[in-house]
Curated annotation (Swiss-Prot):
PANTHER family: MITOTIC SPINDLE ASSEMBLY CHECKPOINT PROTEIN MAD2, MITOTIC SPINDLE ASSEMBLY CHECKPOINT PROTEIN MAD2B. Keywords: Cell cycle, Cell division, Chromosome, Cytoplasm, Cytoskeleton, DNA damage, DNA repair, Mitosis, Nucleus, Transcription, Transcription regulation. Changing Y63A: Loss of function in DNA repair. It comes from Gallus gallus. This is Mitotic spindle assembly checkpoint protein MAD2B. Adapter protein able to interact with different proteins and involved in different biological processes. Mediates the interaction between the error-prone DNA polymerase zeta catalytic subunit REV3L and the inserter polymerase REV1, thereby mediating the second polymerase switching in translesion DNA synthesis. Translesion DNA synthesis releases the replication blockade of replicative polymerases, stalled in presence of DNA lesions. May also play a role in signal transduction in response to DNA damage.
């Protein structure tokens, strides 16, 4: 067993790669399971050795990729506290918030040969949980849209400004109505703990969705 800092072996980059790929799959699957878009734009793929649904819509895919491309440098620096997929009704009020709370330890005690396969097993469990989350959630009203919010540590603000210049994909301070949900129902979905990553996924669901 070896103890490494986050700077060793570009380990922050490895974690960011793993997380970015996972979040891309998770966002697509959430949009499919919660029927934000017609099921006809999704195709079945295999990720983490389980079937998932991924969008075939070029503009939607580009938005998701651009968003996560900008999140990735923040993940590398351990500046991300939460990534939130917010589903909004026609009035742009949130009906559901899928919250990924992310913690990366500063010191890593790892066995490198088993590390990534172990993490992928844990991420597979998240994907399976998202696949069946509609069983514990109420139906959403028709005409929903979505947005992705990133909660960063305060020191990350300067990094985000640099990323904006480089990537030409502007970060916008979240509107309060996208963030706030009055007295939501909290539904824990999954928690994982590994040597490189701790992550918790839960859903905040609005009590009265107006379906």
């Amino acid at each position: 067993m070896t103890t490494l800092t986050r700077q060793d072996l570009n380990f922050g980059q490895v974690v960011a790669d793993v997380l970015s790929e996972f979040l891309e799959v998770a966002v697509h699957l959430i949009l499919y399971v919660r029927e934000v878009y017609p099921i006809g734009i999704f195709q079945k793929r295999k990720k983490y050795n389980v079937p998932v649904q991924m969008s075939c819509h070029p503009e939607l895919n580009q938005y998701i990729q651009d968003t996560l491309h900008c999140v990735k440098p923040l993940l590398e620096k351990n500046d991300v506290e939460k990534v939130v997929v917010v589903i909004l009704d026609k009035e742009h009020h949130p009906v559901e918030r899928f919250v990924f709370e992310i913690t990366q330890p500063p010191l890593l005690s790892i066995s490198s040969e088993s590390l990534l396969s172990h993490v992928e097993q844990l991420l597979r469990a998240f994907i399976l949980k998202i696949s069946v989350c509609d069983a514990v959630l109420d139906n959403n009203p028709p005409g929903c849209t979505f947005t992705v919010l990133v909660h960063t540590r305060e020191a990350a603000t300067r990094n985000m400004e640099k990323i904006q210049v480089i990537k030409d994909f502007p970060w916008i301070l979240a509107d309060e109505q996208d963030v706030h949900m009055h007295d939501p129902r909290l539904i824990p979905l999954k928690t994982m703990t590994s040597d490189i990553l701790k992550m918790q996924l839960y859903v905040e669901e609005r009590a009265h969705k107006g379906t």
